[in-house]
Amino acid sequence: MSSRDKPKTFAEVREEICKRREEMISRDNQKKTKTVAQVREEKGKRREEMISRYNQKKAKTVAQVKEGKGKRREEMISRDNRTKPKTVAQVRDAKRKRTFDHVPRGTREPHAYLRNDPAPQVASVPKSVPEEKDVILDRILSNVPRRKKTTSYEFVPPKHPQEPQWLLQVMSRMNGAGDPKLIIEKNLDSNDVDPRQNRLSIPINTVIQNDFLTLDESRLIDEDEITNEGNMGVAAFLVDQRTKKWNMGFKQWFMTTDSGSSYWSFVLRGEWSNVVETNGLKEGDKISLWSFRSNDILCFALVPPTSSVVESLDK
């Protein structure tokens, strides 16, 4: 039977238990909380460290600030003395000293080398001549960049053709208010005179005076369907030179050309095909469209070309 497998005696077991207890007590002593005196001592040390750091960072007194300013002033004066131009006497004195450094002390005779200079002058600064104030001012102004002359242009509004006399007479009979406004001048295209399409297109970018609609009418046109179908838009009248009146609907369409480009356009619908037939309008005819108000109702006046008026009157 080996010594490891041999059972321990009661005394050996007690000795091991005592050793373990001593180890546990020593570990507890190392980990146990500090006393009040130890905590106060540590707080005092930390307070002293904070006070020392504060004293290093705290603001200087007035005397210390003045002392620092005096030192900086002396440094600036010394730098200025080193950089300011020397007089002729100072330059010669410095040259003499450099020369005497190579001459033995017993043979130095400064009076034999230097001559008297009764009027010392500044070596590097030329003597300034007093100038008149006007001369100085002219010299300063000559270096100032001059402003370029700007020409002002007066805005001249474009001249529109004068409203026809018959339109003023029609407005007076229909209780028209305000001045008539020129909407568009255009040459009729094939779509404008096509009875199947029955509409006059007024591209928005070609409108001459665009303030002929009220706020409610503009909102109604903007909220209309983009499909170019459905509502009639804003109800209006159209009159011609013979004071004949037609019912119209004024809308806004999104139109596309044969080339594929698209644009917004106002459109006059309703009895437009009857207007074309009655006034003998053809493709290429140049017309003018005016706008006015009659009892707050939107009205348009068509000014056809002279040849169409003559032909329609002959009929």
Swiss-Prot record:
Main location group: nucleus
CC per GO annotation: nucleus
Skewed-composition ranges (Basic and acidic residues): 39-51, 66-83, 100-114
Compartments it resides in: Nucleus
GO MF term set: DNA binding
InterPro entries, A to Z: At2g31720-like (IPR005508), B3_DNA-bd (IPR003340), DNA-bd_pseudobarrel_sf (IPR015300)
Name this polypeptide is given: B3 domain-containing protein At1g05920
Species for this entry: Arabidopsis thaliana
